[in-house]
């Protein structure tokens, strides 16, 4: 059975145990920081998609020749037809849905807002983890100072 997180009195731990706690917290902080970067890149991708939708549906772009990506390195020539006003929207893992320009804009706005919220939550978790690391480091410093003082007085 999995047990929930238990509160541990850090002052009761040895310096070696505190060092292990810091290693664990550093590992968690690194994971959170990596996730933060990935979410930021995803949000940037959706913002670019939103800007591309807004650019594509401008009246002056009707009939404009464009390159349509088939893969990351293969493009074919195409022509914008605003009379159709349907766009293929990448919804992830290689799936596309046909949407109107307004629906595509709303989709990408929602994605950006969701990612902004997730990034904010992750940033709060990173801040909390940093505070925990500093608290453990302070206790380690106090214990090291106390150990040094006890050794000198002996």
Swiss-Prot record:
One of its GO terms (molecular function) is unfolded protein binding. Its main location: cytoplasm. It is found in: Cytoplasm. It comes from the Eukaryota. The keyword Chaperone applies. One of its GO terms (cellular component) is cytoplasm. One of its GO terms (biological process) is RNA polymerase III assembly. The keyword Chaperone applies. Keywords: Chaperone, Cytoplasm. Belongs to the prefoldin subunit alpha family. Heterohexamer of two PFD-alpha type and four PFD-beta type subunits. Interacts with byr1. Binds specifically to cytosolic chaperonin (c-CPN) and transfers target proteins to it. Binds to nascent polypeptide chain and promotes folding in an environment in which there are many competing pathways for nonnative proteins. Required for normal cytoskeletal function and when bound to byr1, is involved in the regulation of sexual differentiation. This is Probable prefoldin subunit 5. It comes from Schizosaccharomyces pombe (strain 972 / ATCC 24843) (Fission yeast). The gene is bob1.
